[in-house]
Amino acid sequence: TRIVYMIYVKKVLSIKPRYDNLPKYLIKELLSFSMWIFIMNIIDKLYSTTDTLIIGYIPSLATVGVAVYSVGVTFQGMIQSFSSGLTGVITPKINMMVFSNTSSSELTNTMIRIGRLQCYIVSLVASGFIAFGQDFINLWVGSGYSEAYCVAISVTIPVCIPLVQNVALNIIIAQNKLKFRTIVFAGIAIANVIGTVLCVNAFGIVGASVVTGCTYVLGQGLIMNWYYWKKIKLDIPKFWKNVGPMFIFPAILCICFI
């Protein structure tokens, strides 16, 4: 596809890129940005497949355990897909605001507005699954996969934190400040491997999913929120004062239906 696109640009549009006069600082920034994005994607892939690989090495869990765990993790991917649609729409606006040197207070206000919309989506999907997910899994794949419900909850609830803060992620991408996030992800990925190895034998696939959820809360929740607040100068306490209460009503409904 890329080759066809290059041919189209050169032959049909008659556009010939020139690389001889590129400023050195621009090349340096491009390489730095691309490198951290590349490393981040690799770590993200490793993080998402760690539990499955470790579970697969345990004879008693190698077949059924992997299948059940995969079903549970599927719901995490679903809720991320629901939220990512809005993120793609607002990314150009966030980039423009960052490049225009918009104040931190205005970026925070935008983060709150978009975060509230994302919270509606995330809380609706998550609360619906928590309330009716066990019955749905039993109907979908059978009662033998009942542990997939616990796995899904363990990995889905923690992911709600970064999903309502996607604007903050777009901001640090636009500012080319992904280095810290990449290091944090590498750290929690290592912690996830160690924790999963220690817990999977004693607590099975549910233990593995709980460890993954806890490391996600530590990295994406506590550490990254500190970074957004202290280093990127976003008003994170104000954000959670406005967005956090929106989770209360869905949580009450979940408790009533469980």
Regions found by a protein language model. Name each.
Residues L26-S34, S70, G115-R116, E147-A148:
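Primarily residues marking transmembrane-helix entry/exit sites
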Residues F38, I42-M78, K93-M97, Q134-G144, ...:
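Helix-terminus/linker motif at the lipid-water interface of multi-pass membrane proteins
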Residues I188-A191, K241-I258:
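Transmembrane alpha-helical segments of multi-pass transport proteins
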Residues T63, F129-C160:
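Interfacial segments at transmembrane-helix termini and the short loops linking adjacent helices
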Residues I3-S48, K93-N109, K230-G244:
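Interhelical loop/hinge segments that connect adjacent transmembrane helices in multipass membrane
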Residues S34, F38, I42-I54, I58, ...:
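Short helix-kink/termination motifs in transmembrane helices of multi-pass secondary transporters
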Residues T1-I7, M40, D44, V73-Q76, ...:
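Short runs within selected transmembrane alpha-helices of multi-pass transporters and secretion channels
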Residues G72-G115, C119, L169-A174:
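Helix-loop junctions and terminal segments of transmembrane helices
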